Amino acid sequence: MEIIDGHIHLVEVMAGYGRRGELRAIGDGKARWASGEIMELIPKGYGEKDFTAQSLLRLMNENNVKKAVLLQGSMYGFQNEYTYEMCKKYPERFAGAFTIDPFAKNKIELLNHFIDDLGCKIMKFEISSGGGLMGYHNKFLIDGNEMEDIWRKASEVNTTVALDIGDYTMESYQPEAIRRVALKYPNVKIVVCHLLAPIKGKEEILKRDLELLNLPNIWFDLAALPAIFSTDIYPFPSAQKSIKIAKDIVGASKLIWGSDAPMTAARDPYKNLINYINEDIFDKEEMKMVFYDNALDVYFNKH
């Protein structure tokens, strides 16, 4: 079976920033927030202080993963130029997103540079109050003034936009706003990351919001579900349950497998992040969609 990892991160230089201040690599795959909290972010053997394209390709090759979608996030720090360079170097292996801070004074200039000058066709916004923009900015609306120029530009050039909005306990969790954007800009493909970050015992919220977002131009990636249900062990039954719920509501054609490595691969073996999604959830044709076809359509067919 061919596989695309639809949600992964490169880290040339660890330069994260969030609600806990700056994040600095300290070696052995670990990084420390300004608050003093230490996180293990890079799987052993794949980088002391970084997670390069070469390390990622080795991880992919060892696990028969053909392609990967390189997304951005505040936790590692924006890696826009490095991602662009690696996509140019390995066009058959990578599709890459760029990101900007919607509060940046020169955001229009940045948008035009990445899209018009460099030809980037994917955007990623880590909105999440936990690890993203709303961790260090006041609450803003995903379809509000701060984002309007971004959505308009995305519509002009038919980009794909990936969004991490955190879980339902956070101010960043705005499925209603995503629905409004999707209806306003039907040519923009939107990927909601982490399957809305479901919480164990709150399946009715997941069902409600999947139904709300069951629109032709919205997809959901399955990245980091084993880590979100942090008390589960392989084969991650809570994650499997959430995926079955999603399949029943939006269908396999709207689901994209992703790992969210490197952090998740430091927690669990990368192969387990692939193999927990199996024939108990999807039939053979559905597996092909979730692991390859959907990501190819949403991300790679723009390149």
What are these regions (language model features)?
Residues M1-G6, A15-E62, K66-K67, K244-I256, ...:
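Mid-to-C-terminal alpha-helical segments outside catalytic/metal-binding sites
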Residues H7-V13, D164, H194:
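Histidine-centered divalent metal-coordination motifs
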Residues G47-K49, Q72-Q79, D101-I108, G131-G135, ...:
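Acidic-and-aromatic substrate-binding clefts and catalytic sites of carbohydrate-active enzymes
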Residues H7, M60, T83, F114, ...:
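Conserved, mostly hydrophobic/aromatic
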Residues K66-K67, M75-T169, D221-L225:
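Active-site gating/metal-coordination segments in enzymes
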Residues I3-G6, L71, A97-F98, K124, ...:
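Active-site neighborhood of phospho(di)ester-bond hydrolases with catalytic His/Asp-centered motifs
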Residues I122, H137-I256:
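Catalytic pocket-lining loop regions of alpha/beta-barrel enzymes
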